[in-house]
């Protein structure tokens, strides 16, 4: 369903058309005069007939003649009292266009129904018509012409002045319908009809019109826009012959059904479109549902009189009209000229036209209202309702929101072209830079979204022009509010600084207008509520206040930390909580580093490899096929990755594993891209691939594949983490480094993508065990460990079978140059360089879940050359960490 604002143009056209077809005040007054004169005259006729029948002694009862009220629930007989049952003329009721308020310009035919006690006869019709002329002359000076139409069971009154109105009085009686029902039920009638009884079908039609009028008043009059749409469609039925058969009762039922089934009130344009949609759907087609007549006891189709061709024509016409409306050409459907795009300001009309009620109800007879009038100032009204009313009035009295900087600039300089200069930052928190050129000067600003960046650019431009940016007034008012809150609550030690610096594009947090555009993060890149919860458990956030209307809410949340209270405000409770937590963090923990703040597990931080004991040597740029690896640029510290691995110590599978992106995922610029195995892994232990002059094995058998604080074989099983016991330490001294090796030009399987870099020799790239554990776990002088894995490529949802055999093999081979056979992330290191061949401390990634076999480097011990194996990565359908995996499959989710 379209937003409501799109229907505004349709509303204007429909209302303009409605105004053009709505009767003038003079026409309505003429109708009202004629109807009221006739009603009073008929009342006098009823009194006269009653006097003749009962004599002058019962004249006093004449005042009790009752016109059934228009909202009567039966056919005029339900409200009659016992003493009125003997009257020949029971009452008169308005029906048709007059009762429903559907009169248009040029509608000259009016209708009334005169209810009789018995079946109306020709004699009664003559008597009423004759006396009616006398009574009309007594009631008014206007001249009326009275005609008798026995065939139609009616009396026709015509006026002699403009407009030439014609009022038809239908004579009928409820007895006609009652007898018909008895006949249909098979009962025999004991009473014979008089010979001059009027046409039964005409009488039944008059009774039906009575039911239609009452149903319409009860159901359609209360629906917003329903009466307006019916009037507009009545005009359409007059102009377009195709729609003619729908005119009258079927059209009224259709409109009420379409508009009444909507889940909310609609404007005139939207309501008209809904009626057209209903017709276009084929409701009137021969195989359609039809339109049920609610005023008949038996199931009756109100459009049963239409033939097949008429039904198809109406449906096709409605579809065409709906198509025109969808393309903004509703004026063609309405038969009018298109309105200008800008609405002219209408002068305030002191007496707005009430389009629902055209003719006020009859005042000839005093009718007791059905409902008690609502007591406006009753004392029994609950105080909560009073409070709500006062609150609503206050909300309405609030001034409209001021323009923001972008709106203000567009008013001053319409048609400015904003250009996207760049987009930086990660996918989950991008930073957009927008620029705009104003009077030859170029302005740039950044923000978490294009919209925010444009707003910041506009602020810069307005500041440069020396104009207000639209944020000052709001900031000052917010400041006053916060000051009042501080005075009212002296216990608040540090109220949250609600940052709303629209005028400073580089502000830490955007303004209210843009706060929801990007996430609210601390300087460590975490959610403030989460970070505060890590430091202080069990904090409770309380809602202090909630202001503003439904479209512009303002929440203030408060949290108490260490006896101090902090507040935050925002457009929803989540944002307010975040700002409150942010205020607490800035006040109580201003300079605490993130890695040391975490109180989840108090463990000593693992020293970084390449520190004082293992000084990192600089390396030249490599020559891997993925492009140069930037070896001396450390990754940004303290960035937490999602999933496996983290800052300093890892969690779960692959502990201590993180690439240059510290995310625990295979970086696109990684050397091998498996768990801590290869050039770019932050925990690259053994077989770290140095492209130029590096050691094939990690120097001096660096312990355990550089597991981040966790030793063990770290075999990666499908279901859980497995750490086998640490072998006994070798008592001897650690082996010296291998000799200088020649540059290796082998393919290091570095798939380089975009701007990603691999940090092979940075302070963060070798997280090994603590220094005391960094001696190689070798049982002999030339010991090495051999890890072999047999992997079944795991199909989608299939079982994985991992078989791993590890051999601790003691050889006597001295330094052999660090030959490395990689099997699914494990390493085979003969010679003194071999630790135990897990490759990475927390998980020798066999790629068991993903099903892959990747063969890594083979380094010849004699020449020191680095021969890279062929890219034999057999990936399953699930992707994985193999070097040949698609870059889009680099992220493995658990």
UniProtKB/Swiss-Prot annotation:
Subcellular location: Nucleus, Nucleolus; Cytoplasm; Nucleus
Composition bias, Low complexity: 489-508, 743-770, 777-792, 867-878
Cross-link Glycyl lysine isopeptide (Lys-Gly) (interchain with G-Cter in SUMO1): where in chain: 348
Region annotation Disordered: where it falls in the sequence: 50-86, 363-401, 466-524, 625-660, 718-894
Domain DRBM residues, every copy: 398-467, 524-590
Alphabetical list of InterPro entries matching this protein: dsRBD_dom, DSRM1_ILF3, DZF_dom, DZF_dom_C, DZF_dom_N, NT_sf
GO molecular function: DNA binding; double-stranded RNA binding; mRNA 3'-UTR AU-rich region binding; RNA binding; single-stranded RNA binding; virus receptor activity
Alphabetized PROSITE patterns for the sequence: DS_RBD, DZF
Modified residues (N6-acetyllysine): 100, 460
Composition skew (Basic and acidic residues), residue ranges: 74-86, 372-383, 472-481
Cross-link (Glycyl lysine isopeptide (Lys-Gly) (interchain with G-Cter in SUMO2)), chain numbering: 396, 489
Residues spanned by motif Bipartite nuclear localization signal: 371-389
Biased composition annotated in UniProt, kind: Acidic residues: 60-73
Signal peptide, first to last residue: none
Residue stretches of biased makeup (Polar residues): 857-866
Assigned keywords, A-Z: Acetylation, Antiviral defense, Cytoplasm, DNA-binding, Isopeptide bond, Methylation, Nucleus, Phosphoprotein, Repeat, RNA-binding, Transcription, Transcription regulation, Ubl conjugation
Sequence ranges assigned to domain DZF in this UniProt record: 5-378
Function: RNA-binding protein that plays an essential role in the biogenesis of circular RNAs (circRNAs) which are produced by back-splicing circularization of pre-mRNAs. Within the nucleus, promotes circRNAs processing by stabilizing the regulatory elements residing in the flanking introns of the circularized exons. Plays thereby a role in the back-splicing of a subset of circRNAs. As a consequence, participates in a wide range of transcriptional and post-transcriptional processes. Binds to poly-U elements and AU-rich elements (AREs) in the 3'-UTR of target mRNAs. (Microbial infection) Plays a positive role in HIV-1 virus production by binding to and thereby stabilizing HIV-1 RNA, together with ILF3.
Protein name: Interleukin enhancer-binding factor 3
Classification of source organism: Eukaryota, Metazoa, Chordata, Craniata, Vertebrata
């Amino acid at each position: 369903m379209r937003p409501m604002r799109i229907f505004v143009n349709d509303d204007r056209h429909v209302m303009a058309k409605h105004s053009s077809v709505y009767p003038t005040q003079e026409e309505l007054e003429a109708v009202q005069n004629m109807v009221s004169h006739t009603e009073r005259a008929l009342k006098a006729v009823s009194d006269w007939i009653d006097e003749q029948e009962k004599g002058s002694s019962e004249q006093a009862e004449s005042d009790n003649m009752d016109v059934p009220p228009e909202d009567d629930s039966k056919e005029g007989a339900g409200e009659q009292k016992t003493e009125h049952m003997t009257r020949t003329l029971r009452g008169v009721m308005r029906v048709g266009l007059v009762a429903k308020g559907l009169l248009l310009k040029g509608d000259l035919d009016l209708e009334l129904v005169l209810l009789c006690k018995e079946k109306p006869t020709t004699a009664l019709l003559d008597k009423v018509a004759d006396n009616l002329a006398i009574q009309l002359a007594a009631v008014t000076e206007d001249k009326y012409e009275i005609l008798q139409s026995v065939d139609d069971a009616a009396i026709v009154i015509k006026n002699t002045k403009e407009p030439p109105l014609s009022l038809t009085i239908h004579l009928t009686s409820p007895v006609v319908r009652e007898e018909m029902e008895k006949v249909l039920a098979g009962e025999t009638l004991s009473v014979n009809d008089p010979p001059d009884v009027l046409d039964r079908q005409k009488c039944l039609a008059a009774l039906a019109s009575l039911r239609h009028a009452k149903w319409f008043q009860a159901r359609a009059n209360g629906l917003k826009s329903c009466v307006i749409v019916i009037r507009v469609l009545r005009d359409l039925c007059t102009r377009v012959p195709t729609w003619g058969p729908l005119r009258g009762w079927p059209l009224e039922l259709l409109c009420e059904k379409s508009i009444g089934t909507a889940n909310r009130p609609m404007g005139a344009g939207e309501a008209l479109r809904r009626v057209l949609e209903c017709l276009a759907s084929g409701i009137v087609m021969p195989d359609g549902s039809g339109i049920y007549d609610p005023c008949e006891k038996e199931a009756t189709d109100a459009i049963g009189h239409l033939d097949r061709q008429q039904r198809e024509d109406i449906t096709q016409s409605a579809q065409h009209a709906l198509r025109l409306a969808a393309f903004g050409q509703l004026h063609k459907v309405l038969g009018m000229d298109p309105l200008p795009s800008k609405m002219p300001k209408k002068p305030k009309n002191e007496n707005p036209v009430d389009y629902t009620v055209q003719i006020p109800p009859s005042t000839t007879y005093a009718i007791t209202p059905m409902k008690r009038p609502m007591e406006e100032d009753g004392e029994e009204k609950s105080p909560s309702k009073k409070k709500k009313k006062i609150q609503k009035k206050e909300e309405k009295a609030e001034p409209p929101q001021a323009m923001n900087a972008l709106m203000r600039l567009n008013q001053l300089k319409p048609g400015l072209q904003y250009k996207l200069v760049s987009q930086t930052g990660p996918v989950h928190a991008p930073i957009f830079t927008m620029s705009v050129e104003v009077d030859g000067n170029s302005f740039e600003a950044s923000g978490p979204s294009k919209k925010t960046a444009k707003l910041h650019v506009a602020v810069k431009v307005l500041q440069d022009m020396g104009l207000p940016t639209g944020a000052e007034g709001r900031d000052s008012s917010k400041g006053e509010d916060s000051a009042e809150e501080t005075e009212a609550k002296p216990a608040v030690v540090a109220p949250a600084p609600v940052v709303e610096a629209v005028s400073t594009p580089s502000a830490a947090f955007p303004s209210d207008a843009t706060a929801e555009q990007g996430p609210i993060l601390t300087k460590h890149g975490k959610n403030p509520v989460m970070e505060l919860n890590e430091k202080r458990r069990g904090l409770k956030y309380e809602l202090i206040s909630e202001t503003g209307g439904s479209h512009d809410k303002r929440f203030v949340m408060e949290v108490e930390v260490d006896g101090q209270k902090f507040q935050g405000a925002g457009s929803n409770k989540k944002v307010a909580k975040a700002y409150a937590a942010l205020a607490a963090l800035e006040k109580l923990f201003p300079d605490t580093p993130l890695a040391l703040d975490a109180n989840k597990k108090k463990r000593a931080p693992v020293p970084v490899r390449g520190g004082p004991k293992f000084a990192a040597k600089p390396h030249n740029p490599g020559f891997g096929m993925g492009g140069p690896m930037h070896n001396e640029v450390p990754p940004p510290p303290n960035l937490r990755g999602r999933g496996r691995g983290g800052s300093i110590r890892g969690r779960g599978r692959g502990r201590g594993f993180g690439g240059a992106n510290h995310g625990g995922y295979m970086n696109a610029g990684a050397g091998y891209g498996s768990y801590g195995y290869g050039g770019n892994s932050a925990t690259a232990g053994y077989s770290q691939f140095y492209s130029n002059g590096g050691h094939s094995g990690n120097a001096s058998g660096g312990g355990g594949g550089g597991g981040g604080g966790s030793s063990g074989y770290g075999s990666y099983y499908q279901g859980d983490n497995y750490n086998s016991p640490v072998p006994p330490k070798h008592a001897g001294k650690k082996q010296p480094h291998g000799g200088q090796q020649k540059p290796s030009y082998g393919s290091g399987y570095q798939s380089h993508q975009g701007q990603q870099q691999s940090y092979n020799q940075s302070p963060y790239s070798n997280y090994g065990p603590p220094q005391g554990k960094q001696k190689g776990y070798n049982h002999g002088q030339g010991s090495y460990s051999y890890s072999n894995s047999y992997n079944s490529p795991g199909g989608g949802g299939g079982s994985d079978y991992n078989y791993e055999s590890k051999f601790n093999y003691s050889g006597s081979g001295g330094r052999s140059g660090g030959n490395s056979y990689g099997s699914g992330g494990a390493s085979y290191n003969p010679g003194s360089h071999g630790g135990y061949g897990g490759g990475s401390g927390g998980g020798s990634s066999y790629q068991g879940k993903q099903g892959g076999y990747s063969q890594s480097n083979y380094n010849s011990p004699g020449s020191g050359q680095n021969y890279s194996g062929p890219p034999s990565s057999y990936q399953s359908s699930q992707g994985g960490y193999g070097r040949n995996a698609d870059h889009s499959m680099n992220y493995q989710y658990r």
